[in-house]
Amino acid sequence: MPMGLPPYRPLSPEDLKKIDQTSRLILERVGIRILGQNYLDILKAAGAIIDQSDQKVRFESAWLDEFLARAPSQFVLYSRDGKNDVHLGEGVVHFANGGRVFRILDMGTGGYRLTMLRDVAHTATLVNHLKNISLYIIACQAHDVEPHYYHLNDFYHALNFTSKHVMGGCDDVEGVKQMLALAQLIAGGEEELREKPFVSVISNPISPLTIDANTLEILTICGSNGIPVTCAPAPISGATAPATLAGTLCQMHAEALAGVAITQVCSPGAKVLYGAVPSTMDMRHMEYTMGSVEMAIMNAAAVQLAKLYDFPIYASGGVTEAKRPDIQSGCEKTFSNLMVAMNGADLIHLA
């Protein structure tokens, strides 16, 4: 949807500058823990500062700017038929569904059950017919297939039931390789897929300030094969991040910038989205509250942070604390989507 709403800016220019400077200071003085010796070696060769004793990588400001500048500010998430291509970085807000749930409300029984492969097909079919949803994020984990073939089956069924772009969360290297082989077969070859990739991958660093070797290898494989990726930190205020919203944003921004920069070190020019999935913890009851208003505020702020660097952003909205599709659900989903959309996010997932 083109932006036709007055902008919502939770951060003043002064606040925006302060958070960005603090995040860069975190990367320069504290650093990111990299759990993989080969990637420590790669980053050292690229000029990053390495502390082998605690596997920390620190980034000087000039070094960071050099590699952030290599990330494209615009690219396309292609559909298979060319009718629903998603152009990122052009000032248009796109919505996508949420992904990788493990339980679903069964409309036949009214109760919850584990998700199955048929649910991937059903949700992909639904998204294929929804004009307001620009692409399909693999919605659930199929529990009726062998774990070794989760990603292969998920992507196969998704691509079978929608012609829109398919994005999926991948958490193991073998699964990414299987998905890549499948997509190349469908595209007609490696170069055909590289030219117009109709699949993309979501990966997540570990908050606080850690990226494991598995995630780094996934980012490298995708980047080197032209597959768009997002390295989306998901810090939780009061749990895996500071209790203040500003503190959480500083940490999230540092993690997101590190993800973009490291991806460019491993795969120069890789199509990478600045990712943001910040949320909160109800510290009275130790409950994860993704549907809180603070979550929407932080995601709107994340858009401002991404646009400081002219990066397309994968943000979050459309979430709720309701347990049923009721008026609470509708209200919370509407306003979290609206707050992030009014700041011009390129892609809002969980919508």
Show which residues each predicted segment covers.
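Metallocofactor- and cofactor-centric catalytic cores in central/energy metabolism, strongly enriched
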Residues: M1-L193, P197-A213, D346
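Short acidic/histidine-rich active-site segments
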Residues: I348-A351
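Helix-rich catalytic cores of soluble enzyme domains
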Residues: L114-D346
